[in-house]
Structures are given as structure tokens and as C-alpha cells.
Amino acid sequence: YSQALIRAETLVPGAGREAIEPLLSEASLSVTGADVQTDRVVLDGTAYCQAVYRQGEETTLRALTAQATLSQVIEVSGAAPGMLVRVNAQVEHVESKYENGHMVFLITCGLRAQVLQLRQTELIDAISGVEDIQTVYGELRSCKLAADTDADVLVKGEIALPVALDARTSLMDWGAATIESAEAELGGLRVKGKV
């Protein structure tokens, strides 16, 4: 487990001498690469940030976005090039503040990396010609990676908002995907879920 502090900033449009008051901030983290090296894993990714703020005495709210790159090394004793790696990255805390015409985001991320090594094992299924042998039985689980691929999908939909909200502008956008099932199909895999 490792923690990383990421700083992202963006110019606040139209900012002058008026006070800028951040009201709400949100961030998400995407890991785009994981390289296993000797006794460590190098992670690369991007942090995406959004904030809603008020400028001066205005009654309308404004929003902006920013992003920053992540490059973090996690020490993993026994790791070696060629091993498989699993990574879990999540945003633990995010805050935004206004500094000299810029909205600054400070994002605290929690990172976990697990390395796996494949090794060959021989199974003994019979012994003959020996008497009085003591045996111990154990359960062996074997997994074989049959295929590995990536796929992108565009999900589009609409939600009707009540008229009472008087929502004319989208201030912040975020979403999460949940996989409910994965079934093998001829030539591929059908994944079903919700956003």
C-alpha cells in the first residue's frame, strides 16, 4: 500500500479581484500503465478533477475541470520483470482552493499493487513399488489465462430532470460502472452492467 499526493490546477476564467469560493470538488483516478521492475512497480495514470464555485456576489454557480498525471513507484519485495500485476487505485480525499487566478486541487490517492508469478508444477498421480508410504493430500487450484484484451464502449442515455430544478447548465459530471455478469460467447465475452 502506498499513498500519493497529486496537485492539479487550472486557470479560473474571468477571475479578477472578486472572491472565488469553491463549493464542491470531486476527483477520479485512472491508472493507464503498470510496469513491474526489480522489487518495485511503477504506476502511470491521470487524475481528473472538477469543482463548482461561486465568483464574487454572483448568484449563479460556475464549474471547471482540471487534470494531472500520476507517476508513482510502489516498493514490492520480490517483484521481478515479467510478473503479472494487479493494481487498485482510489481517491481518498480531494480539496480545492483558489490561488492567484488558479483553482488548485490536492488529491490524496491510495494505491495497492500485487504481483503474481506463474510457475510450472508437476503432478504425481500414481506411486508403485513402494510399501508403507505416508501420503498427505492437498487441494491444488490451477488457473490458465486463455485470453487478454481491452475494449472501449460508449454508453449514452438521458435522465429527465424535474422542471422545479431549473437546470440549464451541467456543472459537474461523474459516473461509475458496475459489472453484473460476464458470459462467454463465440469469439468473445458479453459483459452486462449498470452505469
Feature-to-residue mapping (PLM):
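Viral structural modules
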Residues: 1-194
